[in-house]
Amino acid sequence: MKVVLQKDVLNLGDAGDVKEVADGYARNFLIPRRLAVRANDGNTKAAIHQKRLAELKRDKRVKVMKELSASIDGKTYEIKVKVGENDKLFGSVTANDIALAIKNTGVELDKRKLDLGEPIKSVGEFKIKVRLAEGVVPGIIVKVVGQA
């Protein structure tokens, strides 16, 4: 049976793809869970059109993110924090703190795009990846400076 996928399905395809699947798989799993609909001329053409629109939108977003990437790639952002003995921070530097430091330079960036791993808990320089879009991952340097 031919179906048009409504959502991404693991090991099958992405939303908008037209796939040939077993009748039972379509009737008992895909269609009841609204992951797919039975393919006919109307919804097949609509799915192809929607997929084209989504690709254009994604390409536009990637282009904008590449421009943003060029403006922040390799730059150093300094964050001043209070420290105690042995340059140990009171608290930690989080993705939100880094996003605010970047925002202060005039670049709007969502904190969820920062690949921090875990919060920074010491003074020094740290390389951080910014995941802007698929294939667009600039690196920034965060310099954590202690103040008494």
Curated annotation (Swiss-Prot):
Source organism superkingdom: Bacteria
PROSITE patterns hit by this protein: RIBOSOMAL_L9
A cellular component annotation (GO) from this entry: ribosome
GO molecular function, one term: rRNA binding
Keyword set, alphabetical order: Ribonucleoprotein, Ribosomal protein, RNA-binding, rRNA-binding
Single GO BP term: translation
PANTHER family from the UniProt entry: 50S RIBOSOMAL PROTEIN L9 (PTHR21368)
Cited function: Binds to the 23S rRNA.
Listed NCBIfam families: L9
Family under the similarity heading: Belongs to the bacterial ribosomal protein bL9 family.
Protein name per UniProt: Large ribosomal subunit protein bL9
